[in-house]
């Protein structure tokens, strides 16, 4: 009986073994896909942010302190790399434009224009910028903030003919080399006009500017309640004569009587890559 049981067990094991050997080998497990590389930091889309409403902007003008040039030359040579590292850190949330004002302005050597969808992101960049060697030796001489908005007055609905003129005017000059930042503040009389009265004033304001739009690019930022001004006007041009004539035409419109601030400061600078600007101001005394 014992022998028979052993034989049955042995036969069973052989049957199991035979079944395993007789079956085809299982397919190999598929190789694991390599881990995906982290996505590269994607910079803010410049064209998109410059044309969108609701975007925050910070303008700040700076004067280099004379004691910056007491810093060792080797350290000043590294200033541009340090600033560029800050730009790289924040490139997903801000775009930064730089302008050299030294030689044009008494109270500044350069200014920055920072755009961001979130005001906190612009502030974070500026805080980090001021912590660089170059930033620590740059005193802020003016600071203005604002936001972009859709057209308030010369829109398709309110003023279709002028809107068509604005939309059809395309900059056709050489690449702009110069930029202007001009703050504007209106008086209480302006804000107490009816919407229809302000629309009429703005139509009178807009009409004489149309011939200059082929020579001068412009952008408007709204600051009421955000700063001590109502608007920040920004212009780019390669034709300073055309810009001067544009300003003369604006000075002659009735709407100018509502201004309590136009400029003060008016800041003129040359458009510069920020790396070049830092190198220029770090090497020269």
From Swiss-Prot:
Name assigned to this protein: Chlorite dismutase
Alphabetized Pfam families for the sequence: Chlor_dismutase (PF06778)
Organismal lineage: Bacteria, Pseudomonadati, Pseudomonadota, Betaproteobacteria, Burkholderiales
Cofactor remark: Binds 1 heme b (iron(II)-protoporphyrin IX) group per monomer.
Highest taxon, organism lineage: Bacteria
GO molecular function term, any single one: chlorite O2-lyase activity
Gene3D superfamilies from the UniProt entry: 3.30.70.3420
Cofactor(s) listed: heme b
Residues given in the record as Ca(2+) binding sites: 105, 227, 266
Role noted for this protein: Catalyzes the heme-dependent decomposition of chlorite to O(2) and chloride with high efficiency and specificity. Used to detoxify chlorite, a by-product of the reduction of perchlorate, a primarily anthropogenic pollutant, in perchlorate-respiring bacteria.
EC number(s) given by UniProt: 1.13.11.49
Annotated signal sequence range: 1-38
Keyword Cell inner membrane set for record: no
Subunit structure: Homopentamer.
Location of the protein in the cell: Periplasm
Family named by the database record: Belongs to the chlorite dismutase family.
Active site: 218
Induction record: Expressed under aerobic conditions. Significantly increased upon shift to anaerobic conditions.
Gene Ontology cellular component list: periplasmic space
């Amino acid at each position: 009986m014992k022998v028979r049981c052993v034989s049955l067990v042995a036969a069973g094991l052989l049957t199991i073994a035979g079944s395993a050997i007789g079956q085809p080998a299982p397919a190999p497990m598929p190789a694991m896909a390599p881990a995906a590389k982290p996505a590269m930091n994607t910079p803010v889309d410049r064209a998109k942010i410059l044309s969108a409403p609701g975007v925050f902007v910070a303008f700040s003008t700076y004067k280099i302190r004379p004691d910056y040039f007491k810093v060792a030359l080797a350290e000043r040579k590294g200033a541009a790399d340090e600033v560029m590292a800050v730009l790289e850190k924040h490139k997903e949330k801000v775009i930064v434009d730089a302008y050299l004002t030294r030689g044009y302005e008494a109270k500044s050597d350069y200014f920055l224009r920072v755009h961001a969808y979130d005001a906190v992101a612009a502030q974070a960049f500026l805080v980090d910028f001021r912590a660089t060697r170059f930033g620590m030796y740059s005193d802020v001489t003016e600071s203005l903030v604002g936001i972009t908005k859709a057209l308030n007055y010369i829109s398709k609905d309110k003023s279709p003919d002028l809107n068509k003129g604005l939309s059809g005017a395309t900059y056709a000059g050489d690449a702009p080399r110069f930029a202007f930042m001009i703050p504007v503040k209106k008086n209480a009389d302006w804000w107490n006009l009816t919407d229809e009265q302000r629309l009429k004033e703005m139509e009178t304001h807009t009409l004489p500017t149309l011939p200059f739009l082929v020579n001068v690019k412009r952008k408007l930022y709204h600051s009421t309640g955000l700063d001590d001004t109502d608007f920040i006007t920004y212009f780019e041009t390669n034709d300073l004569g055309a810009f001067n004539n544009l300003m003369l035409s604006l000075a002659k419109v009735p709407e100018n009587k509502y201004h309590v601030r136009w400029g003060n400061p008016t800041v003129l600078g040359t458009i510069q890559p920020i790396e070049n600007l830092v190198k220029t101001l770090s090497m020269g005394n």
